[in-house]
Amino acid sequence: MEATGVLPFVRGVDLSGNDFKGGYFPENVKAMTSLRWLKLNRTGLCYLPEELAALQKLEHLSVSHNHLTTLHGELSSLPSLRAIVARANSLKNSGVPDDIFKLDDLSVLDLSHNQLTECPRELENAKNMLVLNLSHNGIDSIPNQLFINLTDLLYLDLSENRLESLPPQMRRLVHLQTLVLNGNPLLHAQLRQLPAMMALQTLHLRNTQRTQSNLPTSLEGLSNLSDVDLSCNDLTRVPECLYTLPSLRRLNLSSNQIAELSLCIDQWVHLETLNLSRNQLTSLPSAICKLTKLKKLYLNSNKLDFDGLPSGIGKLTSLEEFMAANNNLELIPESLCRCPKLKKLVLNKNRLVTLPEAIHFLTEIQVLDVRENPSLVMPPKPADRTAEWYNIDFSLQNQLRLAGASPATVAAAAAVGSGSKDPLARKMRLRRRKDSAQDVQAKQVLKGMSDVAQEKNKNQEESIDARAPGGKVRRWDQGLEKPRLDYSEFFTEDVGQLPGLTIWQIENFVPVLVEEAFHGKFYEADCYIVLKTFLDDSGSLNWEIYYWIGGEATLDKKACSAIHAVNLRNYLGAECRTVREEMGDESEEFLQVFDNDISYIEGGTASGFYTVEDTHYVTRMYRVYGKKNIKLEPVPLKGSSLDPRFVFLLDQGLDIYVWRGAQATLSNTTKARLFAEKINKNERKGKAEITLLVQGQEPPGFWDVLGGEPSEIKNHVPDDFWPPQPKLYKVGLGLGYLELPQINYKLSVEHKKRPKVELMPGMRLLQSLLDTRCVYILDCWSDVFIWLGRKSPRLVRAAALKLGQELCGMLHRPRHTVVSRSLEGTEAQVFKAKFKNWDDVLTVDYTRNAEAVLQGQGLSGKVKRDTEKTDQMKADLTALFLPRQPPMPLAEAEQLMEEWNEDLDGMEGFVLEGRKFTRLPEEEFGHFYTQDCYVFLCRYWVPVEYEEEEKTEDKEGKASAEAREGEEAAAEAEEKQPEEDFQCIVYFWQGREASNMGWLTFTFSLQKKFESLFPGKLEVVRMTQQQENPKFLSHFKRKFIIHRGKRKVTQGTLQPTLYQIRTNGSALCTRCIQINTDSSLLNSEFCFILKVPFESEDNQGIVYAWVGRASDPDEAKLAEDILNTMFDASYSKQVINEGEEPENFFWVGIGAQKPYDDDAEYMKHTRLFRCSNEKGYFAVTEKCSDFCQDDLADDDIMLLDNGQEVYMWVGTQTSQVEIKLSLKACQVYIQHTRSKEHERPRRLRLVRKGNEQRAFTRCFHAWSTFRQAPA
């Protein structure tokens, strides 16, 4: 790479994370002759590269986390070297050269986490040393001469070594600010040197065997010491010397043996963090309440109880974190909940019984951890806090009002919810009402006075002649009313408020602020607005506004610069004129603004108007990998890159191929197809053609792009393949230099807004890392992206584009690597895929409609809050307040059944056998199997309606008709009588275990035949098991029997079978369904049929009709009828009453006698509701009384009321929003039933799909396993 590029202007670069093993260190680093700092962390270096010798201006070198065994090389030849960071290597004493300590400017040395056994020789010669880190080595002694010379040290870290003593010369370190000695066996070190270190700010002595006897008696002279760590020692009480520290802000005394605290802790008036975890504390002194600046208090793993916490702890008004886990707390003081800034409250592993109700008023709380407190009962939320949820008022009174209840009902519900009257509360309400009445009167008086004053001023203005003071006529422009426009989108609030120069550049019709470093540099094809702010003779702010026109500028830029210059004048309220300046013809006043130092640069931004250009697409091929979120890895454009285990995406611009290998997963194929759809939609404007290819079925055009079809497609990608970690660089541009630091995206400070906690540990790229004012280079090994922020300076963009090309050429990269440019807002889909949860969707508050958002803008205070209250989300809970549907009387059901059967002219049945429907035998009518599909063709008579004679017929016509002969009139009447009409309905019945092939077979075969036989008279009704049409059920006259399995397979089995006869809401909805053969399912209010088969040829078995003692007599008679019609004479039949069961066959056949229910009271109260958002808003609807297990929708919430409990059933695909809203609806329903049925209070229970209890399942007829998705 020639030195004519941008490399000589690079002042700093971070190449960490690249792989430089095996001699891959870039030679072009030598061209960075102006390099000041260089980071080579985690690059696999085993020795220092020779190219460092050319960097004569290098000041900072970082080679941490490598495999270096020596620092010998060219370091001593770098005269400007100031800092050497070589932590986490394999350095020994022999690998540290002596001559580096002769460098005059060496001030920072970090050799921590190495294998040193003693201090490096000649270290004392580095007299300008400021920072020295030798921690995590094996050093056992410090030479006395070291601290005689290194007296200017500011930071010293000797932690995790083997030091047993410290040299007395340490008292010479009077400038030392940070001293870290953690993890050294300093038992006999008295630390008498500490009082002499007057500038000390941080002192860490963790795990150094500190006791009361080996600490200084006083540290009063250390007035700057603010951070002390004495954790993991043997202290039995707080050392007295700590009470003398006036500036202490952070104190860590954790993991000691401290049993009590002194009252002297109130001397730490500036303390912000106090850690007393893992001690023996039983109580805290009341003096701790005086630490008003305390923000973090850690008391984990002590012996504190409720009495051990002072009642005045609420005085800690700055407290943000309180952690007291693993103690003996039964309660916490209520005053703790009065700390207004409390964000984190950790109380797990205690003995908590409850918490103060004030816990709900902690507005800043973010973490509340009360786990492993088995006896804890959370306090109820205040009523006013539970009223609204997702902007919906769930109070019982409001929902009754919305449901159309009478005012008396609403008032009664309010009385039920209010409970007993509180005379004290009534007194306070009256007092507040009185005060508010006075406030209203005062507001009315003030409003009246202000209206009078405004009217008076208006009259005075109208009466005054249009003359200025002194009798002079006002200028015409002073009488003009300036339009009230909002310029905040273009100019910030601080514009023109401080003396100085501010410049904007016109880009896409709007002004963009130019950084101060680029003032005086104008692009020939651009236009600028220049604002000079200064103080006039009177000390007031004044302004000069210019708009500069480039010689090559387009018309849109010229017009916008003039317009926005006037907008700026109006925004500032300035009276000056806007002055036009043209390139090459600037005025003297304009040149003086820049001290006659302006320069012109060729180029400029594109015009704001659209231009039509032919887009050039680069052909790329990507390998798709990943499981949950797919990632794309570019591969060479050749057939040998294909691997049968992966999916590949070939992007040819307007042709996109998705190639699926023979061993690739269907999931990745689908995700790759969706990815291609996004590319087509967002980048190709929907013009691209997407083709899905399967290995072995590729068209010739596909292989032409890849240079021909390979002889064999092999598995060549390693099983443990994972691409290198992406590296994100931020391009920095200063006066004559470039910098390229890496973004450590594991640190939250690098993000524009703090990301979610779960995304931080994984080193993931997040969109919040990108700042619109900056330019970034994303190095993904085989892809290099240059991301340009919308508000980034143009010079930085140009430098980044050039630097990205040179960086790609300098580092070892594959040949198919491409450098691409991405502008903010128009990023390619491949670029977005590198980031975690890239979000293109605008943040929208779905709890408010569009009109409410528009109306709410600009409102503030009480007006805004009132507006939000009126714009609540729609929610329909009316079904919860309707009475339960009463059961249909038996006489009415039989009458309806008779009418429907009178209209039935004929009924033919068909059953699916194999792949075709065959006629159902007559003896099997009424018998259905759960794995079969049935079709019933029903022909109904349609009543004939005779037309009445028209009343307007004239009398002459009547007379002539009467005059006809009798036979002719009779024949004519017979001809006019219409024929009786009919209608055909085809009922398709599908068992809950049957596949959808039956419906498809019926649709394409039998239905076509029926439509040809009965054109225009055919209606098809599709039904599933236990969700049948009542009219269809009526044709079987209550003898509707459902067996498990398939017809011919099940009929020959010798296993006992049990059937339950049950009526749901109406005699029309009576079914006899096979259930599990288990005596615990019996119920005294129902009738059951038990079939016990025999192996004998003469007698196939015995069948019992079991009649419960509390069953309905009509159902008992029906059970006997079903018994006789369901089984032929080959079975012995017997009707038995409850309590008369024979032991031999009945209890043996049913599987032994077990306890069972003796009543079915729940049948009189059972109701099923569905809670869903499918209508676009939250609504609750009630299922009919004839519901079944399949009515439980997996993506919704179901509410089941059995008269004692209200079960909230949660499906596996239910959203969190529906769960929260349904919980509120449950609470409203329970409140309503409490007001209607005092004698039957309901309890709320949660049921998840697959974990239903017996009390829940018995409400459903023939409960079984859940139905799988039909094939």
From Swiss-Prot:
Gelsolin-like repeats lie at residues 509-591, 629-703, 759-831, 1183-1256. Disulfide bonds: none annotated. GO terms for biological process: actin cytoskeleton organization; actin filament severing; sarcomere organization. Expressed in blastocyst. It is found in: Nucleus; Cytoplasm, Cytoskeleton; Cytoplasm, Cytoskeleton, Microtubule organizing center, Centrosome; Cell junction, Focal adhesion. The keyword Transcription regulation applies. Residues 495-827 are annotated as: Interaction with ACTL6A. LRR repeats lie at residues 7-32, 33-55, 56-78, 80-103, 104-126, 127-149, 150-173, 175-196, 197-222, 223-245, 247-268, 269-291, 293-316, 317-339, 340-363, 365-385. GO terms for cellular component: brush border; cell projection; centriolar satellite; cytosol; focal adhesion; nucleoplasm; podosome. SUPFAM superfamilies: Actin depolymerizing proteins (SSF55753), C-terminal, gelsolin-like domain of Sec23/24 (SSF82754), L domain-like (SSF52058). Interacts with actin, ACTL6A and NCOA2. Interacts with CARM1. Interacts with LRRFIP1, LRRFIP2 and MYD88. Upon LPS stimulation, LRRFIP2 competes for MYD88-binding; LRRFIP1 constitutively blocks the interaction with MyD88, even in the absence of LPS. Interacts with the nuclear receptors ESR1 and THRB. Interacts with SGK3. Interacts (via the gelsolin-like region) with TMOD1 and TMOD3. Interacts with LMOD2, VCL, GSN and DES. Is a regulator of actin polymerization, required for proper myofibril organization and regulation of the length of sarcomeric thin filaments. It also plays a role in the assembly of cardiomyocyte cell adhesion complexes. Regulates cytoskeletal rearrangements involved in cytokinesis and cell migration, by inhibiting Rac1-dependent paxillin phosphorylation. May play a role as coactivator in transcriptional activation by hormone-activated nuclear receptors (NR) and acts in cooperation with NCOA2 and CARM1. Involved in estrogen hormone signaling. This is Protein flightless-1 homolog. The gene is Flii.
